[in-house]
């Protein structure tokens, strides 16, 4: 038997929408593939997302509770599970036993959804509906990623029309019954499935579920009920976030219908390239130029970090391309579980112009090592030609 969605999120069957969302955020933060060390993190994260998708959709959750986990998944594979009209993720799920004349049958809604009939066919278009999610992008510097930042940004989003208050028509416009759904707000279709012939309803596309049509439309919003306006918002971005990750601001998306809540705003994070550092996960890489004497005799050098400087001991006899590790000078791990490291790759710089004294000293050095030195090709030229 597959794992129950309530068990996946670790909530009770009586949990409301806020409890489910809180549990989802906690589980997602723990098992997100980008931050979790669990070898099965990706599979667990998929289960967590699926559980949240079902349990925060009023109609899907009711069907899940009535059918049970295995039968629900079978029905979903056959195409017998539709998306709920209320995706707000809240606990309000309408009348849980509607359409059975007040009898309180636990199977009222599900049989009305599949087979139609009864009071379940009455207009549902006026129910509160959550607004659409919107998407935007913010750009960060590496220094902001290192510290975390409260980022202010501007987004254009739909807002309720100020002239018609979101109605889409003047308050004195004449109203008539929608001819397509006859005022029901829904249209009905019949199709064949693995369960047999089923009857399903959907929101009327002509009146958008209201069951009514108006003789005039608002000239400001052209009947849409919304206008696009700029909004200035700020979001707290945690230290350690990576390029391509997405943040969610709840209830900052498009306005809902019929008093429903706003959708969410999804913020895609983009991190600018840094002129000095390259990032790999939470580790940073830096190329450090040193002189030949520093490489030969060793030296203590200053190395830049994202938030300042630190010192590095170059050991005697260091070779070009050798790498040194400075612990805890990388990027903080997301969710505050330590810090990455800074890797410093040494590049020995060959001087292009030597004084006569420098040349003689290096030639003597080379000869002392048993090399035959051609004056026309000094020691550094040999080094150059070896690369």
UniProtKB/Swiss-Prot annotation:
Biased composition (Gly residues): 80-105
CXXCXGXG motif repeats: 161-168, 178-185, 204-211, 218-225
Domain J: 4-68
Ranges of biased composition (kind: Low complexity): 121-133
Keyword Iron-sulfur recorded: no
GO cellular component term, pick one: cytoplasm
Top-level taxon of origin: Archaea
InterPro entries linked: DnaJ, DnaJ_C, DnaJ_domain, HSP40/DnaJ_pept-bd, HSP_DnaJ_Cys-rich_dom, HSP_DnaJ_Cys-rich_dom_sf, J_dom_sf
Bilayer-crossing regions: none
Record text on cofactor binding: Binds 2 Zn(2+) ions per monomer.
Alphabetized UniProt keyword annotations: Chaperone, Cytoplasm, DNA replication, Metal-binding, Repeat, Stress response, Zinc, Zinc-finger
Compartmental location: Cytoplasm
Pfam families linked to this entry: DnaJ, DnaJ_C, DnaJ_CXXCXGXG
Gene3D superfamilies: DnaJ domain, Heat shock protein DnaJ, cysteine-rich domain, Urease metallochaperone UreE, N-terminal domain
Protein family (similarity comment): Belongs to the DnaJ family.
UniProt function note: Participates actively in the response to hyperosmotic and heat shock by preventing the aggregation of stress-denatured proteins and by disaggregating proteins, also in an autonomous, DnaK-independent fashion. Unfolded proteins bind initially to DnaJ; upon interaction with the DnaJ-bound protein, DnaK hydrolyzes its bound ATP, resulting in the formation of a stable complex. GrpE releases ADP from DnaK; ATP binding to DnaK triggers the release of the substrate protein, thus completing the reaction cycle.
Note on domains (UniProt): The J domain is necessary and sufficient to stimulate DnaK ATPase activity. Zinc center 1 plays an important role in the autonomous, DnaK-independent chaperone activity of DnaJ. Zinc center 2 is essential for interaction with DnaK and for DnaJ activity.
PANTHER family assigned to the protein according to its UniProt record, in alphabetical order: DNAJ HOMOLOG 1, MITOCHONDRIAL-RELATED
Name of the protein this chain belongs to: Chaperone protein DnaJ
